[in-house]
Curated annotation (Swiss-Prot):
Co-factor remark: Binds 1 Ca(2+) ion.
Protein name (Swiss-Prot/TrEMBL): Phospholipase A2 SSD387
Disulfide bond as UniProt keyword: yes
Cysteines engaged in disulfide bonds, as pairs: 55-71, 70-130, 77-123, 86-116, 109-121
Residues of the signal peptide: 1-19
Biological processes per GO annotation: arachidonate secretion; lipid catabolic process; phospholipid metabolic process
UniProt keyword terms in alphabetical order: Calcium, Disulfide bond, Hydrolase, Lipid degradation, Lipid metabolism, Metal-binding, Secreted, Signal
Provenance organism: Scolopendra dehaani
Keyword field contains Disulfide bond: yes
Cofactor(s) recorded in Swiss-Prot or TrEMBL: Ca(2+)
Annotated localization: Secreted
Enzyme class: hydrolase
GO molecular function: calcium ion binding; phospholipase A2 activity
Length: 147
């Protein structure tokens, strides 16, 4: 077997595995984030999705206010976690599951999760805390989806 064929075969198998995983695995971390938002944020997830330049998919430019800045920090947090604590995973960190619960009004990340899950949970906890701390700055005109 030629080295080129072997390399091609390995790349093809890896690509197929990644595609299958993306199609059939639910985005668990996103589901956790949605659940956390529904449970602990002062506003509904729909009020944040499409808000400013960073809330929702992607993000670029300058945040329009403190709520949008929360989303920019969250995007950066996921990027850092993807490179560090979750770097051993082939898949996107948005597919990684973690456990959390509420203690009164406080979000608590499960210390039994691995470093990756704990770090992702902290990113999500921090954005919910940031949303709630900056709720007075929320401006519906900045929401491209429902505004």
């Amino acid at each position: 077997m030629s080295p080129k064929f072997l390399l091609f075969s390995i790349i093809a198998v890896w690509s197929c595995a990644a595609a299958i995983e993306a199609l059939f695995i639910q985005p668990r971390s996103l589901a956790n984030f949605l659940s956390m938002t529904l449970t602990a944020a002062k506003r509904s997830p729909q009020e944040y999705d499409g808000y400013g330049n960073y809330c929702g998919w992607g993000g670029e430019g300058t945040p329009v206010d403190s709520i949008d800045r929360c989303c920019q920090v969250h995007d950066n947090c996921y990027g850092t976690v993807n490179e560090n604590e979750c770097g051993h995973y082939i898949r996107n960190v948005k597919l990684i599951d973690y456990d959390w619960h509420m203690e009164g009004t406080e979000i608590v990340c499960d210390p039994k999760d691995d470093a990756c899950g704990r770090a992702l949970c902290k990113c999500d906890k921090d954005i919910i805390d940031c949303f709630n701390e900056n709720d007075k700055d929320y401006n519906p005109e900045y929401n491209k989806v429902i505004g």
